[in-house]
Amino acid sequence: MEQKQMQENSYDESQIQVLEGLEAVRKRPGMYIGSTSGKGLHHLVWEIVDNSIDEALAGYCDEINVSIEEDNSIRVTDNGRGIPVGIQEKMGRPAVEVIMTVLHAGGKFGGGGYKVSGGLHGVGASVVNALSTELEVFVHREGKIHYQKYERGIPVADLKVIGDTDQTGTITRFKPDPEIFQETTVYEFDTLATRMRELAFLNRNIKLTIEDKREHKQKKEFHYEGGIKSYVEHLNRSKQPIHEEPVYVEGSKDGIQVEVSLQYNEGYTNNIYSFTNNIHTYEGGTHEVGFKTALTRVINDYGRKNSILKDADSNLTGEDVREGLTAIVSIKHPNPQFEGQTKTKLGNSEARTITESVFSEAFEKFLLENPNVARKIVEKGTMAARARVAAKKARELTRRKSALEVSSLPGKLADCSSKDPAISEIYIVEGDSAGGSAKQGRDRHFQAILPLKGKIINVEKARLDKILSNDEVRTIITAIGTNIGGDFDIEKARYHKVIIMTDADVDGAHIRTLLLTFFYRYMRQIIEHGYIYIAQPPLFKVQQGKKIQYAYNEKELEKILAELPAQPKPGIQRYKGLGEMNPTQLWETTMDPEVRSLLQVSLQDAIEADETFEILMGDKVEPRRNFIQENAKYVKNLDI
């Protein structure tokens, strides 16, 4: 890129500040990258990419490439100014070496180097270096290529010049240390691509490329001129928008930049995603509160002034005006304060005021200029308000006065005797016959059984009042005890294991998906707390004489058959449904904690989960067809 703003805002070794040493990182890596699981492994990539993004935010870089090399190392290349290579005064070493070997050294702490920076907690390159068996850095700067190599954070040799160049930028290649990342050191292309796409949406001037050079070669390029406006269109691509063009707002005040884009659709759920300096603020925060407050106020004001809301009508609540809303709120803040359980909640009070004023002014203008769209938005809110009132009545009917009242449920729930949620589990079972076997086979002390008669309602296509009129949904809500939506309380969960047990056929998979959609939309916290599990009943029963063995997949079946003597010929039964097993078999294979296998449902990426549920369970056929075609190659067992 051309040398813009260089004089007024130099970035050299004098900008690099040093805060503390590196020894602790290898001892307690979780403190610096969250965990040493696959999540922490991928976090290493973002620490390096975030440094390149900082260069882009400062206006010096417009291309970032990430490649997974054949040896599973990662190479990150940018065309920024290149990390400074001059001697850093305090340490007496080249600035690039200080950045790579000293914790909390970098240009993002003083304010002179970068006005706004992303890198989570600014731990940066030194942590990646400490947790890698080897790291190489190539700096293209001032006409020379500077090179240094490190092993587990320690320089192998001094920084040296290895050639001439007419370009600027930094190339970092690192290989994660298997001593630290014992679970896995294998990078997932899709995980990296998802975040690269998100960064491209959030930073409209950057072209990001991700390439996999391993066996299954693939490459993706992301560059969105529309920025977060394109992001909203992407998120709504499988929905029916109420207005064609997403609303886009930007403004800044006191060094804080605010961008908001939103679009309403015909659906009933809302998806608001907020970001600060490219970090997804999962727990929301002041910027999100400012946006929601402005949205509710502006829509109510417009509805009143234009007599869409009558004098006798109550004001629409935030919940009402957010029905069917997809929105991105992205701010760039020079000094963000993060709080909350996972440090993903913005705490700066000024971010609320600035977001509120920037957004409300522009959104008022949008409604005035688009009266037809404005009317649709207000009317959608009034419909949601009616449904909310109806749902409240329905909810009051289902609300139990005490945990003991479950016994009065009409013969559905066979509860356990334990009242300790930490050891109690509930099996949600498909069909009465399987429910009967499960009731007889269970351990009554800690296992409760809830049989479902049929398929529960598809919550993706219905408003809350309709959902709450569904018997199966009401029974599930009452049995689990947490309530739903705004009244949800995780402390009231009666079981810390909610186990979905369905047949291993297409119908079973559909029921499982309907249940997961319901839990995701209305009880998301029980997924986030790790309370939802999927039972794994066996697919095959192998009997030879009196000896019976169970196989949970084709591979296990092959292994069992290979180990059995040829005579007498073993009998193989393929289970189509849970009802084919007697109570003892169901206990031995699927319910006994000593031998059973359970899949825990986790939520890695809320945005991706949201898209997937919308594609699979929403109204539009085309996105669903595309999803099936793209994922068909991963299907192992097809039940036709």
Swiss-Prot record:
<dbReference type="GO" id="GO:0046872">
    <property type="term" value="F:metal ion binding"/>
</dbReference>
<dbReference type="GO" id="GO:0005524">
    <property type="term" value="F:ATP binding"/>
</dbReference>
<dbReference type="InterPro" id="IPR011557">
    <property type="entry name" value="GyrB"/>
</dbReference>
<dbReference type="InterPro" id="IPR013759">
    <property type="entry name" value="Topo_IIA_B_C"/>
</dbReference>
<feature type="site" description="Interaction with DNA">
    <location>
        <position position="458"/>
    </location>
</feature>
<keyword id="KW-0460">Magnesium</keyword>
<dbReference type="InterPro" id="IPR001241">
    <property type="entry name" value="Topo_IIA"/>
</dbReference>
<dbReference type="InterPro" id="IPR034160">
    <property type="entry name" value="TOPRIM_GyrB"/>
</dbReference>
<dbReference type="InterPro" id="IPR014721">
    <property type="entry name" value="Ribsml_uS5_D2-typ_fold_subgr"/>
</dbReference>
<feature type="domain" description="Toprim">
    <location>
        <begin position="424"/>
        <end position="538"/>
    </location>
</feature>
<dbReference type="InterPro" id="IPR002288">
    <property type="entry name" value="DNA_gyrase_B_C"/>
</dbReference>
<dbReference type="Pfam" id="PF00986">
    <property type="entry name" value="DNA_gyraseB_C"/>
</dbReference>
<comment type="similarity">
    <text>Belongs to the type II topoisomerase GyrB family.</text>
</comment>
<keyword id="KW-0238">DNA-binding</keyword>
<keyword id="KW-0479">Metal-binding</keyword>
<dbReference type="InterPro" id="IPR000565">
    <property type="entry name" value="Topo_IIA_B"/>
</dbReference>
<keyword id="KW-0067">ATP-binding</keyword>
<comment type="subunit">
    <text>Heterotetramer, composed of two GyrA and two GyrB chains. In the heterotetramer, GyrA contains the active site tyrosine that forms a transient covalent intermediate with DNA, while GyrB binds cofactors and catalyzes ATP hydrolysis.</text>
</comment>
<dbReference type="GO" id="GO:0006265">
    <property type="term" value="P:DNA topological change"/>
</dbReference>
<dbReference type="InterPro" id="IPR018522">
    <property type="entry name" value="TopoIIA_CS"/>
</dbReference>
<dbReference type="InterPro" id="IPR006171">
    <property type="entry name" value="TOPRIM_dom"/>
</dbReference>
<keyword id="KW-0547">Nucleotide-binding</keyword>
<dbReference type="Pfam" id="PF00204">
    <property type="entry name" value="DNA_gyraseB"/>
</dbReference>
<keyword id="KW-0963">Cytoplasm</keyword>
<dbReference type="InterPro" id="IPR013506">
    <property type="entry name" value="Topo_IIA_bsu_dom2"/>
</dbReference>
<feature type="binding site">
    <location>
        <position position="430"/>
    </location>
    <ligand>
        <name>Mg(2+) 1</name>
    </ligand>
</feature>
<dbReference type="InterPro" id="IPR036890">
    <property type="entry name" value="HATPase_C_sf"/>
</dbReference>
<feature type="binding site">
    <location>
        <position position="505"/>
    </location>
    <ligand>
        <name>Mg(2+) 2</name>
    </ligand>
</feature>
<keyword id="KW-0413">Isomerase</keyword>
<feature type="binding site">
    <location>
        <position position="503"/>
    </location>
    <ligand>
        <name>Mg(2+) 1</name>
    </ligand>
</feature>
<keyword id="KW-0799">Topoisomerase</keyword>
<dbReference type="GO" id="GO:0003677">
    <property type="term" value="F:DNA binding"/>
</dbReference>
<dbReference type="Pfam" id="PF01751">
    <property type="entry name" value="Toprim"/>
</dbReference>
<feature type="site" description="Interaction with DNA">
    <location>
        <position position="455"/>
    </location>
</feature>
<protein>
    <recommendedName>
        <fullName>DNA gyrase subunit B</fullName>
        <ecNumber>5.6.2.2</ecNumber>
    </recommendedName>
</protein>
<dbReference type="GO" id="GO:0034335">
    <property type="term" value="F:DNA negative supercoiling activity"/>
</dbReference>
<dbReference type="GO" id="GO:0005737">
    <property type="term" value="C:cytoplasm"/>
</dbReference>
<dbReference type="InterPro" id="IPR020568">
    <property type="entry name" value="Ribosomal_Su5_D2-typ_SF"/>
</dbReference>
<dbReference type="GO" id="GO:0005694">
    <property type="term" value="C:chromosome"/>
</dbReference>
<dbReference type="GO" id="GO:0006261">
    <property type="term" value="P:DNA-templated DNA replication"/>
</dbReference>
<comment type="function">
    <text>A type II topoisomerase that negatively supercoils closed circular double-stranded (ds) DNA in an ATP-dependent manner to modulate DNA topology and maintain chromosomes in an underwound state. Negative supercoiling favors strand separation, and DNA replication, transcription, recombination and repair, all of which involve strand separation. Also able to catalyze the interconversion of other topological isomers of dsDNA rings, including catenanes and knotted rings. Type II topoisomerases break and join 2 DNA strands simultaneously in an ATP-dependent manner.</text>
</comment>
<dbReference type="Pfam" id="PF02518">
    <property type="entry name" value="HATPase_c"/>
</dbReference>
